[in-house]
Amino acid sequence: MDPAPEPVTYVCGDCGQENTLKSGDVIQCRECGYRILYKKRTRRVVQYEAR
């Protein structure tokens, strides 16, 4: 059995409130109901190989 995915934090495009969503949740701000959410930037190092 796979471990449960961690909830991801999103920022509302209207009011700026942070929202934590899990898979299957409605993509909507919990404060104002706005439907455009932006994913927060990850803290881990992301490195790609250039060719």
From Swiss-Prot:
GO terms for cellular component: RNA polymerase II, core complex; RNA polymerase IV complex. The keyword Isomerase does not apply. It is found in: Nucleus. One of its GO terms (molecular function) is DNA binding. SUPFAM superfamilies: RNA polymerase subunits (SSF63393). Zn(2+) binds at residues 12, 15, 29, 32. Keywords: DNA-directed RNA polymerase, Metal-binding, Nucleus, Transcription, Zinc. GO terms for biological process: DNA-templated transcription. Gene3D superfamilies: RNA polymerase ii, chain L (2.20.28.30). Component of the RNA polymerase II, IV and V complexes. Associates with the mediator complex. Interacts with NRPD1. Belongs to the archaeal Rpo12/eukaryotic RPC10 RNA polymerase subunit family. DNA-dependent RNA polymerase catalyzes the transcription of DNA into RNA using the four ribonucleoside triphosphates as substrates. Component of RNA polymerase II which synthesizes mRNA precursors and many functional non-coding RNAs. Pol II is the central component of the basal RNA polymerase II transcription machinery. It is composed of mobile elements that move relative to each other. This is DNA-directed RNA polymerases II, IV and V subunit 12. It comes from Arabidopsis thaliana. The gene is NRPB12.
